[in-house]
Each structure stands twice: as C-alpha cells, then as structure tokens.
C-alpha cells in the first residue's frame, strides 16, 4: 500500500525536529544518527533516504529557524511575526527573553551551535550565514535610528542578540545571566530606536500559520 501524499515530507520534518532538539541539548559531535532517528520514532537504516550525511541534516536544522517561518515547530520559544512592521523589537524581546534562555531544546540553533559550526563542514557555515543575515534583514526593516548605516545597525543588533544569549547561557549564576540578558535587550532596543516595554511584558510573539493565509 503506497504512503499518503506528503508522507516523505512529514518524516523528514520529524527527523530534523529530533536532530534540532538533540543538537541543541548535546552539540553536533555528541549526537549519533541512531539517536536522531530513534528520537523521530524511526530506524537508523532509513536516514539516507532523506539526507546524504549528518552534515546535510545539520544544515537543514540551522536553516529551518529563520528561512521557513511557517514551520512553527522550529520557532518554539522564540516566535515572531515576520510580516509585522514592528518585527525588529519583537525579535529583540523574544530572542533575549527568559523563555528563550530556559528552553534549551527548542532554542535558536545559532545560540546552541556556533562553536560547532565554526568547526563544521562549509555547508553548515553557509547556512549559518544565511540564517544570520535573515535575522539582520528582519531587524533592519524596522530600524528607526539614523546614527549609522542601517546594515551596520542590523548586524550589530543580531550579534548582540545571539552573542548575548550565548554568554548568558554559559553563566552559572542565573541572576547574572538575567542581568546580562536585560542589559543586552536594553542596549539593543536603544540602538534600534525602539521604546522598551515595561519589565515582564516580553514573551511569546505569534508566528502566522499557513492556514491563516
């Protein structure tokens, strides 16, 4: 009996979802293909029907976060409406939120995997760059500050968000990590020319689904 239409696409999504959680938690080098496939409820032998290598899977894990915003499972914990003219401050508030800090398995791969990417295959580096530049572009669209070129500000904001969360996650002192995140958020919102919400109002921001179109 043939598989239903879309079966292969759904299975591939399950594999990437499993890999994303495991890579975020343990890193690229410390996760086996067997673990990834088991996490998707599949056997190891089926892996190569969907990916040429672990590096190719890694590239897809990185790419799903910003390049496919309709794939909501890749946005758990950091949800942003990319159609909004207010997307810049949404990205900053959500990215540097306590929710994103706490949700390691579902966080942005750029936070969990930068050192792995630096040591990885060129394909993963290209995808990391694409994802980072997509974030820069989203931030640029709602910049109000005119003190420096928009692209410079967009790059600085993206680096402040990603780098700030990487350093916060590395802190053993949670209070210090919160202080660091808050400082990065405050500086980023000032740099973008965006008003800062009162404390405690940052959180999930909705991603439009395909069905909403």
Q: Where are the predicted features?
A:
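Hydrophobic/aromatic-rich alpha-helical bundle segments in the mid-to-C-terminal region
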Residues: 122-130, 142-199, 213
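Helix-turn-helix
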Residues: 14, 18-56, 60
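Hydrophobic alpha-helical connector segments
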Residues: 60, 74-107
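N-terminal intrinsically disordered/low-complexity leader segments
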Residues: 1-8, 194-213
